[in-house]
Amino acid sequence: MAIGLIGRKVGMTRIFTEDGVSIPVTVIEVAGNRVTQVKTLETDGYRALQVTTGTKKANRITKPEAGHFAKSGVEAGRGLWELRLADGEGEGIEVGAELNVGIFADVAKVDVTGQSKGKGFQGGVKRWNFRTQDMTHGNSLSHRSNGSIGQNQTPGRVFKGKKMSGHMGAERVTTQNLDVVRVDVERNLLLVKGAVPGATNGDLIIKPAVKA
């Protein structure tokens, strides 16, 4: 089954192999994903599962959300996510079903999607790895400036897409082909090798790797 799940980044640690080799791992808490809606070709034009996870205070739920959760008969969660299904996937899954981390028991590699840490407004050196200019030799103001961006008469303008200073981070990022180190069904934990996007407690979408 190639269905993805929603998880929460707990943090990083390391585990040791039988040979004593240290492996850096990210701990992802994958609590039960409750199915709130099943989208089909007949009704929606495509196949997908809408899921929620976690909990949310009753006074923080909007009336449309409350009606949607009541209709599906599922406890309100901290958000709603949609997971697309390919042909033949998700057969037999109905509204109210709960998916857990056990579906990754036979998966070797996963793709993890999250929102990267926001860095605010940053210059070209930090944002795009530009080289700095001379610290001396007559340069007193432009050590970290972007340099020439539009030339003179030719082309006499700044090309679209030019790498410049601006807002950095807080983007949807996917890290591909992360090794699954351990699946702990009892504690709803998934351990993957290496780092994943985002800050601690951030929501993540975990799917079997498309390039595995």
Swiss-Prot record:
The keyword Cell inner membrane does not apply. The modification N5-methylglutamine is found at residue 153. GO terms for cellular component: cytosolic large ribosomal subunit. Gene3D superfamilies: 3.30.160.810, Translation factors. GO terms for biological process: translation. Residues 136-155 are annotated as: Disordered. Methylated by PrmB. Belongs to the universal ribosomal protein uL3 family. NCBIfam families: L3_bact (TIGR03625). Part of the 50S ribosomal subunit. Forms a cluster with proteins L14 and L19. HAMAP family: Ribosomal_uL3_B. This is Large ribosomal subunit protein uL3. It comes from Shewanella oneidensis (strain ATCC 700550 / JCM 31522 / CIP 106686 / LMG 19005 / NCIMB 14063 / MR-1).
